[in-house]
Each structure stands twice: as C-alpha cells, then as structure tokens.
Amino acid sequence: MVLFKVRKVCYLETYWKERVVEKMKVLFIGDIVGSIGRDAVEKYLPRLKKKYNIDVVIANGENAAAGRGITRNIYNDLLQMGVDVITMGNHTWDNKDIFDFIDDADYLVRPANFSEEAPGKGMVQISKNGVTLSVINLHGRVFLPPHEDPFAMAEKLIEEARQTSPLVFVDFHAEATSEKIALGWHLDGKASAVVGTHTHVQTADARIYPNGTAYITDVGMTGPYDEILGMTKESVIYKFQTNMPSRFEVPKKGREVLSGFFVEIDNQTGKAKSCERIYINEDYPFQG
C-alpha cells in the first residue's frame, strides 16, 4: 500500500505539471486625465505590477496632457513609469505636438479607423517573455465624429495580428454602451479582450464571453476623483445651469482615482482565462 501511494502521488504531480497553462497577464489603465492622473499611475503602477505579476501594461493616454491629447514628454514619461503601450481616442489631435513625434512613437496607437491619411498606426505588437500581444485601438461612431467602420477594421487587423500570435487586445474608444457591447460580442473568440474607454465612468459588467473574450464596457478614468469626468466641477455645473459656453479645465491638485482592468490570457489559444476590475482611491484604497 505504501508503494502504491507513492507511485500515485508521483503520477498526479507529473499530470498536473503537464496541465499547467502559461498565461500573459495584462493590465489596462483607463483614460489618464492630466497631471493628477499621471501621478496616480506613478504612485500605483509599481504596486499593481507586484501584486498581479503584470507582463504588459496598456494605458489610454488621450487626455494625459491637461485633458487634451498627449505630448512627446508625457509619452516618454509614461513609458518610463512602466507603461508599455499607449492608446488614444477622439482627443488624439488636440495637442499639435503629436504631429512631430507620432510616426516615430513605436508604442503609441491611435484609432485604426481614422482616415487613411492620418499619421501614426492603429495597431502595435509587443513581445514579452517570448509571447507577442497585438494592441488595436478603434474609435466609435455613435454620438461621435464619423470615422471608418470599426467592426470591419477590427476584423481586418485581428486577422493580420493572429498570423503572428493569437493574443489580441482591443481598446474601443466609444460613447454608446450599445456600440461597445455589440463590438464585444462581434469579436468574441477573435480578440482576447475588448475594453471600452471614453466615458470616464467604470462599468460593473466585466466578464468573459462564451468563446473566451474578456470584456468591460468602460474601464473608467485615472485622474481627479472629486471632479466631473476629470474636469473642474464648477465649469461643468455652470454650463448645465446656464446653457452658456464654459471652458472645461483639468485641476492640477486634488485626490486621485485609478481605474483599470486586469486580464489573464492563455498563451496558446489567446483566450482570456480571468479578468478583474480595478478601482483605487481614498475611499477604495489599494489592497496589496
């Protein structure tokens, strides 16, 4: 009996070693707004990397420069903080500095369904530990300026990406909840993850679709916690009360919030194995 038990244990250990599935762990950080948002990334990213053993960090940076686009210096600063890929959105061209460096920015992705004449690129591929992840940025068309069909562009780029690796991450920068959910279902089993950005409010619908695509309608914002979508309360309230023009400003001081989305992806199949919303501020402190 003793010999049998030893053999049985050895057999089970071998069996489970063969069953171990390697995964890529990806952290996506929601729309970084202004200096408060950048400070939140610098403050919490090292802790998040340690807690989740992150392989790749993606962040939406279209509001990183005082809410209006991104600059070369901010792009470089975010990379130095540990962000691997930066996605954009409808504010891509707000800061004219971007035209001077976007074509040379290897890890900056603007919406792929912008005009064919637009500089920059709509997909980048990054390799970590011998595994390649493709990151695609798309722009919605409902309640936003018109662009090319994001559904068709997604299919085209995913087919191209999967020739290299089945791991594909999509940031869909869109306004309408229905449009985001529709793309999520449309790409189920084709993309590893589809995350929504733009509205700056994190949604409570993180899930993995039946064919292995992790999804959340909006990751939320990383920026000023006590303001309105990252803009000063007073300017927004004034506009609602008076229906008069009001210049929205991003505060430089105040409490911060970091919103994120964590997903584990099977390196062999490209399917999501787990996902989790991340929301950190003084009311919901980081749990290390």
What kind of feature is each model-predicted range?
Residues 20-288:
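Acidic, metal/ion-coordinating pockets
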